[in-house]
Amino acid sequence: MRHLRLIATLALAAATGTGGASASADPVWVVSQQGAELARIEAGTVAGRIPLGPAPVAAAADRAGRLYLTHPDGRAVTVVEPGKPPRRLPVPGQAFGLAASPDGAHLFVGDWSGDRVLRISAATGAVEGTAAVGHEPAHLVLDRRGRLYVADRESRQVSVIDTGTMTRVAVVPTGEAPFALALAPDEASLYVANVRSGDLTVIDTATLRARATVPAGRMPYGVAVTGDGSRILVTNQHAAAVTVIDAARLEIVATVAVGPYPEGIAVVGPRAYVANWFSDDVSVIDLATWRETARIKVAEGPRTVLAPGEPAR
């Protein structure tokens, strides 16, 4: 499982956090894989901690504030609901990438070793359908039309799935080892971080074709987009930095130093939050100055950052 541990981060823009906080501020949720913990960050500090099962990886949320987390080694999904203890759903496969329907009825789970995506009931875990994809499906993103985009890491492609019929409707070639995905706010573009080729593939979601490839730093791993869609933020594991790309010109306009081995990233209003795997903390970036303004300690091995914002798709 060492290869999974080294690529186990997703940067997700998701629905509201639990606890009734407004979407204009925190909370920000941080998943620590080695520490098996979900931390809630509010007002620049850790305001709560939820113990999880071993090695949680990916996270998603629905409009009701329920959080979902995958455990590849445990073949399971943990469900965290406001006011209730976490519950566990068994998954018939190596659960890795994850997306949730906005109403929380369905979960879409990438089976890392099975080259497929499962649609399961979020209430019972019952399998409702499957779709074949490429090798080692990583990040999953669901759009407002019900199309699911899947980064097929070892197939150098993104699979596009109709979630109503659970059929693959398109395959889009990318760079080497696509891992993290992010949709533009208007969903006209999908940004794909390619780990081994050091670049970003930009996919036109209307034509389902790649329209550009952009250098994105040393080992780009996580990707997020600012709320106005003007900037794309990409973590660079081997540079301890975040590369900032102008979305209109598709040019690098800034580089922000963060902690060692940055992985997941999420944007919340005027700030971005970056999970630093090697230093067990989260960097806070001011989007006006493009500078790191704080580091927040969390449990060992932070991989995923889940932030409030647009509803989960």
Features from the language model and the residues they span:
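N-terminal secretory signal peptides that target proteins for export/translocation
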Residues: 1-2
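Predominantly soluble domains enriched in secretory-pathway, periplasmic, or organellar proteins
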Residues: 5-313
